[in-house]
């Protein structure tokens, strides 16, 4: 039996799992396992809406079971990957180990502050659902403080926000 392990249920991981699930649908000699730390897919391109308070967090979470409902060949596993042993062809999760013959790494990327001074210490990233909720809470807190601030300069400072980055995420966040 050939075992294919896909690490990460973002756009690339889901796309790979669906394609492989369809390709090997009737092949009993192929096992496909999709491992992700969450039982849901986060619609990353909509995180700005959560951060801006336009939608609730659940609106950008998609249950992996629903996504793969008709892809019976794909086994979904919720686990956090902590290592990969190339010699033994094993993905090590916090809960289990997963042997593979073929491995697809689709964990996504990470936010980059490009070395801009002060961003890492004072800023937020918009790279996860939890981060979007932290940004929303921060904005609400600043607005609540500004509402009761009599000093115009302090009030303006509380209501001033800087977005570092003019990529898709940054531009969408400014639009919120």
Features from the language model and the residues they span:
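Beta1-alpha1 glycine-rich phosphate/pyrophosphate-binding loop at the start
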Residues: 1-75, 82, 161-162, 171-176
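Conserved glycine-rich "GG(E/T)P / GGGxP" loop and the immediately following alpha-helix
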Residues: 165
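Conserved anion/nucleotide-ligand pocket segment
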Residues: 168
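FAD-binding core/adjacent interface of flavoenzyme oxidoreductases
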Residues: 1-3, 74-162
